[in-house]
Amino acid sequence: MNFVLALTVNTLLALLLMTITFWLPQLYPYMEKSDPYECGFDPAYPARIPFSMKFFLVAITFLLFDLEIALLLPLPWALQTTNLPLMTTSSLMLIIILALGLTYEWSQKGLDWAE
């Protein structure tokens, strides 16, 4: 009963908030207010310069490998199961996939900064 009540209240609250944001008028920002502030002077450089694609690729690679390391963390507890060959095989497969991904990224020069 408590679960149904909490689910109903949360659903109604989410629908209410979505309805309010849909029907509120759209605010149009002024160009003066959206300009970057640099000590009262006009900015010396544009504020919205594009960033390097190399940096983006390295950041995405870091996030992917960080997530996969988070998958490796519970392996010591998982290896205490009764079906040890299955857990060992799946652990080795995950590590092999990580190693193959790293070697592919390395061979494609995705981790090299200097060109």
Swiss-Prot record:
Q: How does it sit in the membrane?
A: Multi-pass membrane protein
What is the first-listed, main subcellular location in coarse terms?
mitochondrion
An annotated Gene Ontology molecular function: NADH dehydrogenase (ubiquinone) activity
Q: Its catalytic activity?
A: a ubiquinone + NADH + 5 H(+)(in) = a ubiquinol + NAD(+) + 4 H(+)(out)
Q: Which residues cross the membrane?
A: 3-23, 55-75, 84-104
> Tell me, what's a Pfam family for it?
Oxidored_q4
For this protein, the Enzyme Commission number is 7.1.1.2
Q: What does this protein do?
A: Core subunit of the mitochondrial membrane respiratory chain NADH dehydrogenase (Complex I) which catalyzes electron transfer from NADH through the respiratory chain, using ubiquinone as an electron acceptor. Essential for the catalytic activity of complex I.
What family does this chain come from, according to its entry?
Answer: Belongs to the complex I subunit 3 family.
The entry's protein name is NADH-ubiquinone oxidoreductase chain 3
Recorded source organism is: Pongo abelii
